[in-house]
Amino acid sequence: MRTGPSNETGSSTKATEMTALADAFRDTFAVEYVTAREVMDRRAREVGSRPMVLVDVRGEEERAVSVIEGAVSAETYESTRSTLGPHDCVCYCTIGYRSGQYAEKMAKAAAGGTDDARYFNLYGSILAWTHAGGACVVPATGERTTRVHTFGKQWSCVADGYEAVYFKRPLAKGFGQMVRGWFGRKK
């Protein structure tokens, strides 16, 4: 893993980079998007509304660095979703590609069934979360952190005040995760 300085460019430049990355595939997935600010506002008024679950679909090594406070892994979500009742599932990854795939897959699987979940993709994912000033925590300790795993250097456009951590060889790591996904998960 490598660590990138959080102040390589100005915050507005990094926000522009993040938006360009997120917009590059926004129309790729047949899912609704929600912004980081909308999630934050909804969490602030959660009482009496439909429950919302944040699902981090990134790999275990990425999640070990930090997650959005209150998020669960895809594995945890899948093993507990039948006990949640009607809820909204907001999926995220680094920039929104993997979470878009996951949200679309889950929405298709739920269609026509008894699953009363609605699936959303967090626009810009954890990168957008940093630009909105959202809290991240280390899952092992629950302590707040400004370190965020961005998978690869090209996605390290976290907001000022956050530190990007990424794989040295993201394509090799991504291919390994993809292969494990093919053979390691039940459909």
What are these regions (language model features)?
Residues 2-37, 60-88, 100-187:
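Rhodanese-like catalytic fold shared by cysteine-dependent sulfurtransferases
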Residues 34-49:
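Glycine-rich, flexible N-terminal cofactor/catalytic loop recognition
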Residues 39, 51-58:
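Short hydrophobic beta-strand that contains or immediately precedes a catalytic carboxylate
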Residues 49-50, 69:
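Sequence-level motif detector for i,i+2 pairs with an aromatic at +2
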Residues 53, 88-90:
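Structural motif
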Residues 56, 92, 122:
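Active-site-adjacent beta-strand anchor residues
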Residues 94-100:
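Gly/Ser/Thr-rich loops at beta-strand to alpha-helix junctions
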